[in-house]
Regions:
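Noncatalytic alpha-helical scaffold of FAD-dependent oxidoreductases
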Residues: 1-178
């Protein structure tokens, strides 16, 4: 018997969620003959808003406001200034040489991705919402942003740490509860 599942209606008339039932059976109940995936294109543009030299409390406030804003951020991190704090190496002159990052000190980085027009507008909205002075920010263009987030992903900023490093991925809505 051929059964079609998915699309607008996920459940069949019996009330069973066929997708979960099929996945849970590890192929013992059915043979899949046709599978359709929804694939989203890679973002056209990605920029990172860097906010320089703020206290931890202010950085957490920026992160909280940006995550809960309507600007649809795709990444956020606070990197402290002092290597005594979590063993973070934040001498930006030596660690990350790009034309927009020439300052020492702690930084908060917020990534926004999407279409070029949308990204620029959302960055401006975020700057206005957070009430940041322009002399305290840098904006990394797409290629710079990719390099920065690759360094974050590989924990390169923490390479001299003597502490244990734990990388966790959590839903943005749970960040406030940490």
């Amino acid at each position: 018997e051929i059964i079609k599942s998915g699309g607008v209606v996920v459940k069949n008339v019996t009330g069973y969620d066929l997708s979960k039932l099929i996945c849970g059976s590890y192929g013992t109940l059915v043979a899949l003959t046709e599978i359709t995936f929804k694939v989203l294109p890679a973002p056209e543009e990605g920029k990172t808003l860097i906010i320089h030299n703020q206290r931890v409390e202010l950085a957490l406030d920026f992160l909280d406001k940006s995550i809960s804003s309507s600007n649809d951020i795709s990444g956020a991190i606070f990197l402290p200034e002092d290597s005594k704090v979590a063993g973070c190496v934040m001498n930006i002159e030596n660690t990350f040489k790009l034309n927009d990052l020439k300052r020492d000190g702690s930084i908060t980085a917020i990534r926004i991705e999407g279409s070029k027009k949308s990204v620029n507008q959302r960055i401006e909205n975020l700057i206005n919402e957070l009430k940041i002075k322009n002399n305290n920010i840098s904006i990394l263009e797409t290629y710079q942003s990719e390099i920065f987030w690759n360094k974050v992903k590989s924990l390169e900023f923490f390479y001299k740490s003597k502490n244990s490093i734990l990388r966790t991925v959590i839903p943005p809505s749970e960040c406030v509860n940490l």
